[in-house]
Amino acid sequence: MPLPVSITTLLLDIEGTTTPVDFVFKVLFPYARDRVADFLATQGADPEVQADLDLLRQEYAQEAAAELPDWAGEDAIAAVPYIQWLIDSDRKSTGLKSLQGKIWEQGYVSGEIKGQLFADVLPAFQRWQAAGLAIAIFSSGSVQAQQLLFGYSEAGDLSPHLSGYFDTRTGPKREAASYGAIAAQLGKAPAQVLFVSDIPAELEAAATAGFQTRLSLRPGNATVEIGDWTTIHSFDEL
């Protein structure tokens, strides 16, 4: 189904929408998990890293999970078991996402990591931009991680095509208020924004806020209940 004429902005999820799910789980997560101890040993005194650790400690104090690992000691390295537990649990922790972004930056800059995108992403970005449409990202990954993925992608630097990045600091992806906040920051009426995601609960929140939506059905995505959602298999359909 072509884009509705009322749409002026596309708001895109990353995992399962612009990027294969496997890239996140088989490349990014293991990269951060394997390197977090060395990273904290060398960068743990950095004020920005300390801010991430302070946030993680606040989250740790509120955890109720029975299998929660110990966080014993004040030095940065003491946080490693909890951080690895969060990664293994795929927790949407703001502190974790921020710290992961800093670790991934080293991989992207060194060339060890290249952001993976579906083949239709760059042509779609070029087409939408030529049509005068704005493109923004909303992901549970930190803004820094988003900028790295698109700035160091296999298709080159796609950042000139993007006009905004939003993460969980704006709000949870499954709460309508988050989408209202994004529309306000973009300076758009909610009905002018099309949100594309592979998660129906996120689409529900966006629709509640007045956004138009599309359910992304990409290869490798988890099976979901399609229900009444309008679906796409490729950005070629938009």
Curated annotation (Swiss-Prot):
InterPro entries: Enolase-ppase_E1 (IPR023943), HAD-like_sf (IPR036412), HAD-SF_hydro_IA (IPR006439), HAD_sf (IPR023214). Its EC number is 3.1.3.77. Pathway: Amino-acid biosynthesis; L-methionine biosynthesis via salvage pathway; L-methionine from S-methyl-5-thio-alpha-D-ribose 1-phosphate: step 3/6; Amino-acid biosynthesis; L-methionine biosynthesis via salvage pathway; L-methionine from S-methyl-5-thio-alpha-D-ribose 1-phosphate: step 4/6. Binds 1 Mg(2+) ion per subunit. Keywords: Amino-acid biosynthesis, Hydrolase, Magnesium, Metal-binding, Methionine biosynthesis. It comes from the Bacteria. It catalyses: 5-methylsulfanyl-2,3-dioxopentyl phosphate + H2O = 1,2-dihydroxy-5-(methylsulfanyl)pent-1-en-3-one + phosphate. Its cofactor is Mg(2+). Belongs to the HAD-like hydrolase superfamily. MasA/MtnC family. This is Enolase-phosphatase E1. The gene is mtnC.
